[in-house]
Design a protein with these regions (language model features):
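A conserved acidic, glycine/proline-rich C-terminal tail/linker
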Residues: 246-258
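Structural detector of well-ordered beta-strand residues that form the stable sheet scaffold
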Residues: 229, 250-251, 272
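C-terminal binding/interaction regions
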Residues: 255, 259-291
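Short, structured coil segments at secondary-structure junctions
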Residues: 245-246, 267
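Glycine- and Gly-Pro-enriched alpha-helical subdomains that act as flexible
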Residues: 176-232, 244
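Helix-rich terminal scaffold detector
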Residues: 235-237, 250
């Protein structure tokens, strides 16, 4: 399996700014060949007990976390005890590993504990792109009746000034983005603004799955009292993942969708959008923000 980045030769074209003096004649366009660093994107197959569950396009790295977090977001597992073994495969051979070890392939196979089952509705035989998972696959009613929801019991209060500072802290921790400019990120923070973990990926939902998987594998679920920040927008699926991980606050630098706001409201999640500079829009769960 390759790394998180790949180098590629590109043609750099520069168009000069218009001459404010109105000089006549065509502008001179310059071009030069150079090497550029790109964010890697490869398929990852997720299997449960040897049976294919889904395939997603992701940035390689933290694949076991991604697979484990995906199972949490699909309400298949709730804690570390629901998983008995994890294997990473290269397509022909598989090796058992601790989740902290390096991955060796593009398939993750997870063995579930006795009594933990994958429902027929959760099984997928199609490709999930890096831009979005299967948004809205699970209905709001289905999610809100799960034991993980609603989140109303989590009465953590967050300071608006602390929330406003999170985007800068997330950007400082985005090591691969700083070299490629091509990755989304998700960061998990305490209510006091301390960064617990950050993950980067070509897909926002993958980055969130990696964080949730990290929490599951380290026996930290549910993530009560935490805030999750994502780059880009907040979709229904990201709200679903936050709710099922027990995260009481989800913030995004862009807008949420209408269905995301509806689910957040029903599940008791504080949903924040347009978190930029000193301002933010609070769509649901305003009681968790101090006056």
């Amino acid at each position: 399996m390759s790394g998180r980045t790949a180098r590629r030769r590109v043609l750099r074209v520069t168009v000069p700014a218009a001459d404010p003096g109105g000089a006549s004649g065509p502008a001179r366009v310059t071009a030069s060949a150079r090497a550029d660093l790109l964010a890697a994107e490869e398929p990852l197959g997720i299997r449960v007990d040897g049976t294919a569950l889904t395939m997603t396009m992701r940035t390689p790295g933290d694949d076991v976390e991604l697979a484990a977090g995906f199972l949490v977001g699909e309400a298949i597992v709730r804690g570390r005890d629901d998983i008995t073994a994890m294997k990473v495969c290269d397509g022909t051979t598989c090796g058992h590993l601790d989740h902290s070890d390096d991955e060796i392939g593009n398939i993750v196979d997870i063995a579930l504990a006795p009594g933990v089952e994958v429902t027929a509705g959760a099984r997928r035989s199609f490709m999930t792109t890096s831009a979005c998972g299967v948004c809205g696959k699970t209905s709001i009613d289905d999610i809100c009746v799960l034991p993980q929801a609603p989140l109303s019991a989590d009465t953590t209060v967050f300071e608006p000034a602390v929330i406003a500072a999170l985007p800068d802290r997330l950007r400082e921790a985005q090591r691969v983005f700083s070299s490629t400019g091509g990755l989304h990120a998700a960061g998990l923070f305490t209510a006091s603004g301390d960064l617990l973990v950050v993950r980067e990926d070509v897909g926002r939902h993958n980055a969130v799955d990696k964080i949730v998987g990290w929490a599951l594998l380290n026996a930290k679920l549910p993530l009560a009292g935490c805030a999750l920040l994502v780059s880009g927008r907040a979709s229904f699926e990201l709200v679903q993942k936050a709710v099922l991980a027990g995260i009481p606050l989800l913030a995004a630098v862009s807008a949420p969708s209408s269905l995301a706001a509806e689910l957040a409201d029903e599940a008791g999640l504080t949903l924040i959008g347009f978190l930029r500079g000193p301002s933010m829009n609070v769509y649901t769960g305003t009681q968790r923000l101090s006056a």
